[in-house]
């Protein structure tokens, strides 16, 4: 992406049709300079349902979407374990990528993704909505008024009663750290604007 698209809408492809897509589309539908061109999923049936629900013009396979020259960027809303593979395929095809959080299930995956983005000179971003949340920007504006930040305490949680959910399955990259802990880590880094010197962790 760049100067070549400054005078037209950014054309998006949905590379997946996961549950989070419904919430993402509520925001996307309010943005004037983006156009959802097509949707792809593991099954054509799932993609077709999404296309009908959100009036998306085309239903494609993953391969068809990545070969399309009229798609500038793809959004990847699939389970955590599939993020890296799809993101790298998209970037190798010359597409910019917005991938749901966590972008990778470990730092090694993220490093591979960023290396791929640099090699192919495309945009790569992890979709963390709190990064642009108005309240966060307001907090940042007042940090200088309170002096040096010495302690940051965060809590981000929700109730989950489905013990069979992938969120509870470590073999499917489940667990609180990858699902919601990323918000606490992003917030802390935004506030401190520094890399950690060392990390102490615990679990039970």
Language-model regions, residue ranges each:
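Predominantly a Rossmann-like dinucleotide-binding segment in NAD(P)-dependent oxidoreductases
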Residues: 130-201
């Amino acid at each position: 992406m760049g100067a070549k698209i400054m005078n037209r809408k950014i054309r998006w492809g949905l590379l997946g049709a996961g549950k989070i897509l419904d919430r993402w589309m509520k925001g996307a539908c309010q943005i004037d300079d983006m156009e959802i061109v097509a949707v792809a999923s593991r099954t054509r049936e799932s993609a077709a349902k999404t296309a009908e629900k959100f009036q998306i013009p085309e239903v494609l396979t993953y391969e068809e979407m990545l070969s399309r020259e009229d798609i500038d960027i793809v959004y990847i809303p699939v389970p955590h374990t599939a993020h890296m593979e799809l993101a790298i395929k998209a970037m190798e095809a010359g597409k910019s990528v917005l991938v749901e959080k966590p972008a990778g299930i470990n730092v090694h995956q993220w490093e591979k993704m960023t290396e791929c983005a640099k090699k192919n000179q495309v945009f790569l971003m992890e979709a963390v909505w709190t990064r642009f949340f108005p309240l966060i920007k307001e907090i940042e504006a007042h940090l200088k008024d309170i002096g040096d930040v010495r302690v940051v305490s965060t809590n981000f949680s929700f109730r989950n009663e489905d013990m069979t959910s992938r969120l509870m399955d470590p073999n499917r990259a489940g667990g609180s750290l990858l699902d919601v802990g990323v918000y606490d880590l992003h917030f802390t880094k935004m506030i401190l604007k520094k890399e950690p010197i060392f990390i102490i962790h615990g679990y039970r």
